Amino acid sequence: MLISQRPTLSEDVLTDNRSQFVIEPLEPGFGYTLGNSLRRTLLSSIPGAAVTSIRIDGVLHEFTTVPGVKEDVTEIILNLKSLVVSSEEDEPVTMYLRKQGPGEVTAGDIVPPAGVTVHNPGMHIATLNDKGKLEVELVVERGRGYVPAVQNRASGAEIGRIPVDSIYSPVLKVTYKVDATRVEQRTDFDKLILDVETKNSISPRDALASAGKTLVELFGLARELNVEAEGIEIGPSPAEADHIASFALPIDDLDLTVRSYNCLKREGVHTVGELVARTESDLLDIRNFGQKSIDEVKIKLHQLGLSLKDSPPSFDPSEVAGYDVATGTWSTEGAYDEQDYAETEQL
């Protein structure tokens, strides 16, 4: 079985709606394979929301004008196609726009229902004069890709209901390039640099995660043909490899106090790997193993980048009473008493 080093993925946030992702190292040729697949999926298959039809008070079709409104109905529809919305509802929802002149009508004048958000409230829709009045009913639906107005034309729709071209994709632009990168003595590995720009309705990070999930589901169809088929197996990342090496260390290397060390040895915990498999509750069940011993173990594991099974990843040694992070020592007030340093039981 061929084992490849696990690639890492990093994100460089450029703006609120644009990020650059770097995936490396990839086996030669896989930069283009992965980059092209992700780009296509990001542009065509990320679910989003869009306006599918509108109804303007006093208007029967799009080839007309509204009294007191500078733009004709066709221009208003073109503007509404640029509306950026998100919806948490699977079913169609209705938004309303009511504005009386004079003044500019923007997307911020739209009143969305609960679960629907307008992300570009400053977008221009129309301009009203002193006598202008605009009342619009907008239907928003969820979907993928691009759907032309002719497909949004519902049979039996009421007179005056105007279908609109729907651009569901929340992704504006995706580009990628592949550079060479070095792994040990080899310099022919690929580094994929993916630039993702989205609308404000979704972050680039979430868009990439959605694309990855879609591809995993689709490629899983081929995998199911023979789950035992041989392929390239992704090995651990350098950080994971360091953790694996740490698991084999004897607890002697943690330099624990005698009490903590003896308690763990008596319980049959001989390696770091066996220790991180325990929870705080498991350790507290050990005779003579108290909260101070728990704190000591958590600090020692934190220094290796590890933690107990149920410890939160945000553990901060500086918050442990009596422990000085700078010197790695315990103050008198928070220190272990003498019996913690005296061997309490012969093993």
Swiss-Prot record:
Catalysis: reaction(s): RNA(n) + a ribonucleoside 5'-triphosphate = RNA(n+1) + diphosphate
General function of this protein: DNA-dependent RNA polymerase catalyzes the transcription of DNA into RNA using the four ribonucleoside triphosphates as substrates.
One Gene Ontology term, aspect cellular component: cytosol
Segments of this protein annotated with the region Alpha N-terminal domain (alpha-NTD): 1-226
Recorded domain comment: The N-terminal domain is essential for RNAP assembly and basal transcription, whereas the C-terminal domain is involved in interaction with transcriptional regulators and with upstream promoter elements.
Subunit structure: Homodimer. The RNAP catalytic core consists of 2 alpha, 1 beta, 1 beta' and 1 omega subunit. When a sigma factor is associated with the core the holoenzyme is formed, which can initiate transcription.
Protein name listed in UniProt: DNA-directed RNA polymerase subunit alpha
The protein's enzyme class: transferase
Domain of life: Bacteria
Listed GO biological process terms: DNA-templated transcription
Up-regulation conditions: 3-fold repressed by starvation.
Species of the source: Mycobacterium tuberculosis (strain ATCC 25618 / H37Rv)
Signal peptide: none
Record family assignment: Belongs to the RNA polymerase alpha chain family.
Enzyme Commission number: 2.7.7.6
Alpha C-terminal domain (alpha-CTD), as annotated region: 243-347
InterPro entries xref list: DNA-dir_RNA_pol_insert, DNA-dir_RNA_pol_RpoA/D/Rpb3, DNA-dir_RpoA, RBP11-like, RNAP_asu_C, RNApol_insert_sf
Keyword entries, A-Z: DNA-directed RNA polymerase, Nucleotidyltransferase, Transcription, Transferase
Listed GO MF terms: DNA binding; DNA-directed RNA polymerase activity; protein dimerization activity
